[in-house]
């Protein structure tokens, strides 16, 4: 199994990328990595080169580059060549910590979409209070979506939850402004009806953003704009709460410090529950091969978990299962036509 790595993407590349790659290589004997980037920077970081191949690239895509233009003009960039390797069958999947916009463009224009999927969605795994977590898509690959896009997200998210997160019969919820079936605008009402009628989906109805961290669904589907806003609200709230707790302990004098000492184990457990690094990266679902985006500020441990996540997608043939579903259920693909009619 070969994974193409954009070794130059991210805030701390290539150091954390190579460290994460070597740890994943040592943990899984079936993994082989193609490292795309500046050989002079990558080679000194490698402790053992077994199952690692460096492909030197003279260019890289920067965070301030215009995404589509960068993909089209920087033909020798590490991200572009890694995506080309996947397209040409030289690698089974790709991982990058680089620019999200550029990576989405590389996925769409180089790797390509599954035939039935009109708009691939970005899927991260998020925490729940019971520690099990849930997946949500789309969280920003698209600014606007139609009802049938959300139906496709539900199908793809369900396969991902089964294959990668080991969830039997995953519950699918539609993010809405109320739990009643008639809630939301026309788009959400139509999406609700499509999800309720779709074969093979365990649809549990609408879910609210105020409740999703309690785990009412294993897969939460939403349009990209709402999903991105919800994701950022969750991340910001978690950071703020943890900061406030630390502040209350350190500023509370002796009693605060004593209380913090007694609560140390509980606070550590809480921090661990909401630490998403062990969940890996966000997957762009709907492409012809797995494409995973890890956070630009990710550390080596997050890179390691992202690579294990990627390997699981490849091993279980998640992309093939999604494509086969749409081939076997033309009525789902026809939801687009029915919606327009």
From Swiss-Prot:
The keyword Acetylation does not apply. Its EC number is 2.3.1.274. It is an enzyme of class 2 (transferase). It comes from the Bacteria. It is found in: Cytoplasm. One of its GO terms (biological process) is fatty acid biosynthetic process. GO terms for molecular function: phosphate:acyl-[acyl carrier protein] acyltransferase activity. SUPFAM superfamilies: Isocitrate/Isopropylmalate dehydrogenase-like (SSF53659). It holds the Pfam family FA_synthesis. Keywords: Cytoplasm, Lipid biosynthesis, Lipid metabolism, Phospholipid biosynthesis, Phospholipid metabolism, Transferase. It catalyses: a fatty acyl-[ACP] + phosphate = an acyl phosphate + holo-[ACP]. One of its GO terms (cellular component) is cytoplasm. Pathway: Lipid metabolism; phospholipid metabolism. InterPro entries: FA_synthesis, Phospholipid_synth_PlsX-like. PANTHER family: FATTY ACID/PHOSPHOLIPID SYNTHESIS PROTEIN PLSX (PTHR30100), PHOSPHATE ACYLTRANSFERASE (PTHR30100:SF1). Catalyzes the reversible formation of acyl-phosphate (acyl-PO(4)) from acyl-[acyl-carrier-protein] (acyl-ACP). This enzyme utilizes acyl-ACP as fatty acyl donor, but not acyl-CoA. Homodimer. Probably interacts with PlsY. Belongs to the PlsX family. This is Phosphate acyltransferase. The lineage of its organism: Bacteria, Bacillati, Bacillota, Bacilli, Lactobacillales.
């Amino acid at each position: 199994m070969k994974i193409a790595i954009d070794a130059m993407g991210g805030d701390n590349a290539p150091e954390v990328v190579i460290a994460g790659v070597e740890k994943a290589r040592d943990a899984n004997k079936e993994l082989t990595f193609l490292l795309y980037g500046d050989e002079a920077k990558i080679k000194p970081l490698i402790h053992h080169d077994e199952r690692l191949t460096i492909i030197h690239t003279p260019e890289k895509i920067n965070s301030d580059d215009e995404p589509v233009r960068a993909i089209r003009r920087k033909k020798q960039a590490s991200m572009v060549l890694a995506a080309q390797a996947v397209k040409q069958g030289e690698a089974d999947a790709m991982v990058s910590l680089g620019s999200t916009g550029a990576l989405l463009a590389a996925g769409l224009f180089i790797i390509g979409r599954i035939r039935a999927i009109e708009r691939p969605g970005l899927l991260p795994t998020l925490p729940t209070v019971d520690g099990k977590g849930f997946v949500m898509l789309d969280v920003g690959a698209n600014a606007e979506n139609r009802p049938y896009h959300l139906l496709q997200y539900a199908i793809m998210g369900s396969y991902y939850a089964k294959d990668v997160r080991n969830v039997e019969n995953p519950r699918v919820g539609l993010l809405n402004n109320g739990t009643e079936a008639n809630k939301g605008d026309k788009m959400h009402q139509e999406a609700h009806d499509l999800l309720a009628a779709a074969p093979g989906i365990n649809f549990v109805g609408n879910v609210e953003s105020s409740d999703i961290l309690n785990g009412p669904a294993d897969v939460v589907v939403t349009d990209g704009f709402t999903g991105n806003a919800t994701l950022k609200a969750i991340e910001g709230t978690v950071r703020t709460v943890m900061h406030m707790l630390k502040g209350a302990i350190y500023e509370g004098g002796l009693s605060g410090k004593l209380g913090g000492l007694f609560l140390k184990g509980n606070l550590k457990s809480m921090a661990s529950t909401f630490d998403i690094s062990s969940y890996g990266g966000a997957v762009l679902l709907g492409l012809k091969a797995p494409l995973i985006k890890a956070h630009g500020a990710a550390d080596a441990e997050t890179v390691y978990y992202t690579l294990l996540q990627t390997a699981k997608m490849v091993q279980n043939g998640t992309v093939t299962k999604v494509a086969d579903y749409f081939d076997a259920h033309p009525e789902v693909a026809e939801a687009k036509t029915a919606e327009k009619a």
